[in-house]
């Protein structure tokens, strides 16, 4: 049995979980999230969410722990939320935002303007002498990761000097330059 899937998810105070017709809905102070599920049975009892599978088929074993983790992330999201920070490393790399529009200058001939989803709150930090930082916060972990990966994908860190967009705290694999 899945070690992750068999452990129940505790529902904290202020969070409501509803299960109906293969869809689970989690509501909390930060918002509401829904997730479809198949091949597993989700039940809510005694302030806990239980995920069970009907057989030991390979697909069901794979989805058992997955759906338990997704439900856990939904509950954490509507109570505490998630944060990701990206750092722009490079000369002339700048960032600014006007509402939900992110304006990135990453060394291309043009600025990249990205419309951020309304569920994600955006903050840009630019201090003199330090690398600019983009701070993203959301209650939806999947959407947050998707937006952060899209921003990072505009200029991935290169292995020689480390220039590019990287997550704060990310350790880059560096290469030695050519020897003379």
Language-model region placement:
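N-terminal intrinsically disordered, cationic/polar leader segments
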Residues: 2-149, 153-180
């Amino acid at each position: 049995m899945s070690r992750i899937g068999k452990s129940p998810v505790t529902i904290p105070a202020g969070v409501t979980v509803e299960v109906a017709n293969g869809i689970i809905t989690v509501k909390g102070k930060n918002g509401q999230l829904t997730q479809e599920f198949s091949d597993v049975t989700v039940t809510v009892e005694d302030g806990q969410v239980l995920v069970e599978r009907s057989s030991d088929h390979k697909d069901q074993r794979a989805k058992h722990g997955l759906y338990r983790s997704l439900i856990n992330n939904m509950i954490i999201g509507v109570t505490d939320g998630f944060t990701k920070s990206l750092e722009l490393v490079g000369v002339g790399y700048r960032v600014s935002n006007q509402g939900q529009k992110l304006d990135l200058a990453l060394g291309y001939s043009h600025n990249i303007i990205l419309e951020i989803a309304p569920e994600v709150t955006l903050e840009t930090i630019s201090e003199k002498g330090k690398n600019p930082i983009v701070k993203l916060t959301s209650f939806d972990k999947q959407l947050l990761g998707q937006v952060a990966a899209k921003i990072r994908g505009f200029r991935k860190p290169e292995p020689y000097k480390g220039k590019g967009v990287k997550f704060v705290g990310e350790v880059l694999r560096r290469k030695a330059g050519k020897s003379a």
